[in-house]
Amino acid sequence: MEFWGVAVTPKNATKVTPEEDSLVHISQASLDCTVKSGESVVLSVTVGGAKLVIGTLSQDKFPQISFDLVFDKEFELSHSGTKANVHFIGYKSPNIEQDDFTSSDDEDVPEAVPAPAPTAVTANGNAGAAVVKADTKPKAKPAEVKPAEEKPESDEEDESDDEDESEEDDDSEKGMDVDEDDSDDDEEEDSEDEEEEETPKKPEPINKKRPNESVSKTPVSGKKAKPAAAPASTPQKTEEKKKGGHTATPHPAKKGGKSPVNANQSPKSGGQSSGGNNNKKPFNSGKQFGGSNNKGSNKGKGKGRA
């Protein structure tokens, strides 16, 4: 490999011709310092009658640019600058890769071409011969052997089918047994669940009977409450016995003549009547009972007149 470079002047194109069996590689281009600021220079190359733009240089922004261009034949470099020169640099190298490729191709082709050809032919030939022999032997013998060979196969197939069906039947029976066992287990579980559900329901009627008993007992307490009012009348009777007189009933009858009769009929009364003669009985006489007898006689007379 050898370094290479060329300076291209304004308005002048520079031709470059690579040597035989060699290549020219352009890697970089740059401007001189004499170029004014703000001026841009366009770089171009002409190969085989075609002019191509390869880049643009500027003193302020892009004073140099990198390339990776390889040429194996004559080419021409130029630029659009008016005062500055453009320098192209790179290197030369021998064209060795082409020889390597050709030699490798030449070596690979003879080795690859003859090797697969005989193997393919022999394999195909052997296979073809085997196929022909296999075809000719059964053709020589008629189809008498085929039915004999097919019958045991069919019998074997029938037997295998029968075995498969019997196995399937056994599996189905097993499945039915398993299903029945599962159903029995489910029924037992359901019965147990029903028993468990029924057991907590038994105390409910007991609770329901309790309020009925309390309700039936309440009227009994009401009946017993009636004699409780009796003690209220006992002190009055004792006072009447002490006084020897009989008080009038709290609710007098509408007819005036019946009240004295009721007073005489009562066993506990002092034997008073509506008439004044009954008030003179000896067991009612006395100073202690005088006032009560007079009051009773007066009440009886008044009621009889009414």
UniProtKB/Swiss-Prot annotation:
Gene Ontology terms: biological process: chromatin organization; DNA-mediated transformation; negative regulation of DNA-templated transcription; polarity specification of adaxial/abaxial axis; root development; seed dormancy process
Tissue specificity statement from the Swiss-Prot or TrEMBL entry: Expressed in leaves, roots, stems, young plantlets, flowers and siliques. Highest levels in ovules, embryos, shoot apical meristems and first leaves. Also expressed in somatic embryos.
Sequence ranges of Low complexity compositional bias: 111-132, 264-297
Compartments where found: Nucleus, Nucleolus; Nucleus
Gene3D superfamilies, sorted: Nucleoplasmin core domain
Region (Disordered): 97-306
Sequence segments annotated as region (Required to repress transcription): 2-5
Composition skew (Basic and acidic residues), residue ranges: 134-151, 199-212
Protein name in the entry: Histone deacetylase HDT2
Native organism: Arabidopsis thaliana
Gene (UniProt): HDT2
